[in-house]
């Protein structure tokens, strides 16, 4: 007779997090939306590329809206009610991502622009000639 191995699995307890932080990184090529708790522990992330957009369609405001909506709906399971939004970068999906998070049903407590601005640091790249 062979021994039967018994595998014990622990049930994952869903944490209840009432408020969190939505980090929106909007570059010229893509938009990354990460939703964390107050301590910075990542709960869910989504990008324009992961939402099914490829190439030049990744950098559109609609792609950023879809990515933020997808991330917002995934975190509703935690019982989150309000979000603080931190926007980073100069991309075209900045405002549409914030608007879609509020349309999902979150109360936006405050919006902070955390884009790093140099005090005349590095020399910028040369101008494109097309």
Swiss-Prot record:
Determine if Electron transport is one of this entry's keywords.
no
Keyword Ribonucleoprotein attached: yes
Q: Which GO terms describe its cellular component?
A: ribonucleoprotein complex; ribosome
List GO molecular-function terms, semicolon-separated.
rRNA binding; structural constituent of ribosome
Name the GO terms of the biological process aspect: translation
The SS bond pairs are none
Q: Which domain of life is it from?
A: Bacteria
What keywords were assigned to this record? Answer: Ribonucleoprotein, Ribosomal protein, RNA-binding, rRNA-binding
Record family assignment: Belongs to the universal ribosomal protein uS11 family.
Database matches in NCBIfam families: PRK05309.1, uS11_bact
SUBUNIT field: Part of the 30S ribosomal subunit. Interacts with proteins S7 and S18. Binds to IF-3.
> What job does this protein perform?
Located on the platform of the 30S subunit, it bridges several disparate RNA helices of the 16S rRNA. Forms part of the Shine-Dalgarno cleft in the 70S ribosome.
For this entry, the protein name equals: Small ribosomal subunit protein uS11
């Amino acid at each position: 007779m062979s021994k039967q191995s018994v595998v014990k699995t622990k049930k994952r307890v869903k944490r209840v997090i009432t408020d969190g932080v939505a980090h929106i990184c909007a570059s010229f090529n893509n938009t990354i939306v990460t939703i964390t708790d107050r301590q910075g522990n990542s709960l869910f992330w989504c990008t324009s590329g992961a939402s099914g957009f490829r190439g030049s369609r990744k950098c559109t405001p609609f792609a950023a809206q879809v990515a933020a909506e997808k991330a917002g709906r995934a975190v509703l399971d935690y019982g989150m009610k309000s979000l603080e939004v931190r926007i980073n970068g100069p991309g075209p999906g900045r405002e549409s991502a914030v608007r879609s998070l509020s349309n999902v049903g979150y109360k936006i407590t405050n919006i902070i622009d955390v884009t790093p601005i140099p005090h005349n640091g590095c020399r910028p790249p040369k101008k494109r000639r097309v």
